[in-house]
Amino acid sequence: MRFDRRQWWIIAAAALVFALVFGVRQSQALFISPLNSATGLGIASISLAFAVAQLMWGITQPFAGAVADRYGSGRVIALGGVLVTLGTVLTPHAHSTWMLILLIGVVAAGGAGMAGLGVLMSAVGRAVPPQQRGLASGIVNAGGSFGQFAVVPVAQLLTGILGWVGALSAVGAMALAAAPLAWLLRGRPEAAPAGQRAAPEKSMRAAVRDAMRDPSFIYLTTGFFVCGFHVAFIATHLPGVVASCQLPPEVAAWSLSLIGLFNIAGSFTAGWAIGRWRMKSVLSLLYAARGLAVIAFLAAPKTTSTFIVFAVVIGFTYLATVPPTVGLVAKLHGMRFLATLFGIVMLSHQIGGFLGAWLGGKMFEATGGYEWMWYADVMLAFAAALIHLPISEAPRFRSAAAAA
């Protein structure tokens, strides 16, 4: 089955919004060193602001999802894009830890949560038939990866032309484009095609209560915590890892860009795979692959080639976990409150992200390196691979069955 023109417009708009917002967020790590030099706040304090951003991104998503589930996605996404721009553009003017936390950790990250995956995937999921949701979510997720691939090297290039303050402001302004794109995603849950909605009598509170009583939902949410730990640690501290290996900053920029590029392929592959194999099996395989990739990275000499190869391999798994995770939430608990329920899963992801970003900075200041963070990465990856195995993919409730 192919998407019709309207569905393609919705998918493309969601993918482009995610590309802009995620690209801006991922490029911010390139500015940690100049921000530290300009403010003297210290890597640990700046890492704390980035860690709070991970947490705020997660905290925002269930509430943004609840508003979108009730009133529609368009206004939520548009406001999110504006806040990302506002927080990012004002960041160079933060000269205290608390101001940095407010701008990066609250304003920009809160906006990113409002224009985040929970709201976007819900808008797309309601517009396409159930059997096509895996592919559609893979396309949207690939949009974020393309944003990372495209925006990070542009940010590095602009730094050489405009200086870091001008570059950060220019990159932040890109997120404003999410506002007009949100018009294409303005539909409300009630506008979903017949047969794709949950039973109308089920309330949001009941849907959340039922999900929190479901062991499979808890396993899935716990596994996504690990994904957040991995992604935030790498996104925030890979430039620092490169610098500690006495390699030029361009290696970090291109590594982050390649992670985004190859996650496009990973997202498409994951979206395709969940239409053919059990989603929990795809997730277990992805987490195990991450663990093996980090082990190989630790064993290899730290050269430019090593970082490039690592970026390619880890990029294939980076956000490829999103399509099967979204798919499982929708399959188990239906489409009606997907933005809210996936927002809860994303909150767990971002709690992991908070720890990955914050502990990376603390570990560096305590030991002068990141080795123990990589060891934690490996252990958590294999734990996540195992915790998905007992998940049952049978729809738990009548409303989920009706939606799936």
Predicted regions and their residues:
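Cytoplasmic helix-loop-helix junction between adjacent transmembrane helices
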Residues: 104-142, 328, 334
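Extracytoplasmic gate region of multi-pass secondary transporters
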Residues: 28-32, 214-268
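Extracytoplasmic
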Residues: 9-43, 61-64, 234-239
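Hydrophobic core of transmembrane alpha-helices in multi-pass small-molecule transporters
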Residues: 99-115, 225, 306-320
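C-terminal ends and interior cores of transmembrane alpha-helices
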Residues: 82-95, 289-302
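Residue-level signature of mid-helix packing/kink "hotspots" within the transmembrane helices
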Residues: 26, 54-62, 148-149, 260-268, ...
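Helix-to-loop junctions at the C-terminal end of transmembrane segments
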Residues: 60-72, 267-279, 364-365
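Helix-loop-helix hairpin linking two adjacent transmembrane segments in secondary transporters
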Residues: 140-190
